[in-house]
Amino acid sequence: MNIHEYQGKEILRSYGVAVPNGKVAFSVDEAVEAAKELGSSVSVVKAQIHAGGRGKAGGVKVAKNLDEVRTYAEEILGKTLVTHQTGPAGKEVKRLLIEEGCDIKSEYYIGLVVDRATSSVVLMASEEGGTEIEEVAEKTPEKIFKEVIDPAVGLQGFQARRIAFNINIPKELVGQAVKFMMGLYQVFVDKDASIAEINPLVTTGDGKVMALDAKFNFDSNALYRHKDILELRDLEEEDVKEIEASKHDLNYIALDGNIGCMVNGAGLAMATMDIIKHYNGDPANFLDVGGGATAEKVTEAFKLILSDENVKGIFVNIFGGIMKCDIIADGVIAATKEVGLEIPLVVRLEGTNVELGKKMLKESGLNITAADSMADGAQKIVSLVN
């Protein structure tokens, strides 16, 4: 689950991590009032959406007086920002962060991620702050420094100091930088975050180390024990179909293609998307119905896929282990009848009760194309859609 920058900064502030003073605003008048209350000679007007690249898209402006705050707030609020992370549709700005300006001396990148290779949390840092870390990793990987954190003891002071020296934090500010990193790590662990990025971390003219931006992603599986984090969820920033999917315990991610996919198991779902691409098709979604799908769940999955008007065909690819193929066949038949399916449907079944499942599909009298293998199914649905 993602949260907004201003929410992330409030969490950091509660842990004693330095961030600029700021206030959230939902209207132009609120933005002006916030700037007035902050009383800074320079204010920063920042669009709040769940995506990076806001500055390049015109979503971050520096205002030197209240009139400029009003002008920029009017310009940004209601605007659709298109960045490299929003996709071509972009995201509409519905709230702003009004923040005190600061005298920036240097910019850095600090991030915490879960590293699958080491099964540990890794602290990453670079003196190339303010730019996309992916670009730094690709062009100058030697400028990224990492510390693998032992979960038994947590981030150690010597590790944070080593990072600070490696990215050339001024010696007189190393103590502040270490305190910052230790606080950030504590937030990461306490709140079950999966990503925490500060880009940029800055040093200022008056000798401070603070977060100028904050991005957090939290493990959705742990939200049951973090009611405070769950309250920060902004449903308007999420895909409506993904919200609906979560209500029915379906794992759904919308994509840009025209072939709907319904699969059981994340690995098989990814392989299904890959093989559709291999045969020159474009998957419209990732949809994992899980191991215990019922006929009702399959019906909801169909409705979800068909809610995407770009879908021109559906490929059902099921391996019946825990879930029997005849149960899936029953669900597919019921769903096809209920939604009045009018687009091509290809079904590939394998596993427990596969012959019974295939027999049920064949005798249903519905326009369902059977596939003998995953490759056969992918070829058939691509051919039918094209």
Curated annotation (Swiss-Prot):
Signal peptide: none annotated. Its cofactor is Mg(2+). Its EC number is 6.2.1.5. SUPFAM superfamilies: Glutathione synthetase ATP-binding domain-like (SSF56059), Succinyl-CoA synthetase domains (SSF52210). Mg(2+) binds at N199, D213. It catalyses: succinate + ATP + CoA = succinyl-CoA + ADP + phosphate; GTP + succinate + CoA = succinyl-CoA + GDP + phosphate. Keywords: ATP-binding, Ligase, Magnesium, Metal-binding, Nucleotide-binding, Tricarboxylic acid cycle. It is an enzyme of class 6 (ligase). Residues 9-244 form the ATP-grasp domain. Pathway: Carbohydrate metabolism; tricarboxylic acid cycle; succinate from succinyl-CoA (ligase route): step 1/1. One of its GO terms (molecular function) is ATP binding. InterPro entries: ATP-grasp (IPR011761), ATP-grasp_succ-CoA_synth-type (IPR013650), ATP_grasp_subdomain_1 (IPR013815), SUCC_ACL_C (IPR005811), Succ_CoA_ligase-like_bsu (IPR005809), Succinyl-CoA_synth-like (IPR016102). GO terms for cellular component: cytosol; succinate-CoA ligase complex. Succinyl-CoA synthetase functions in the citric acid cycle (TCA), coupling the hydrolysis of succinyl-CoA to the synthesis of either ATP or GTP and thus represents the only step of substrate-level phosphorylation in the TCA. The beta subunit provides nucleotide specificity of the enzyme and binds the substrate succinate, while the binding sites for coenzyme A and phosphate are found in the alpha subunit. Heterotetramer of two alpha and two beta subunits. NCBIfam families: PRK00696.1 (NF001913), sucCoAbeta (TIGR01016). Belongs to the succinate/malate CoA ligase beta subunit family. This is Succinate--CoA ligase [ADP-forming] subunit beta.
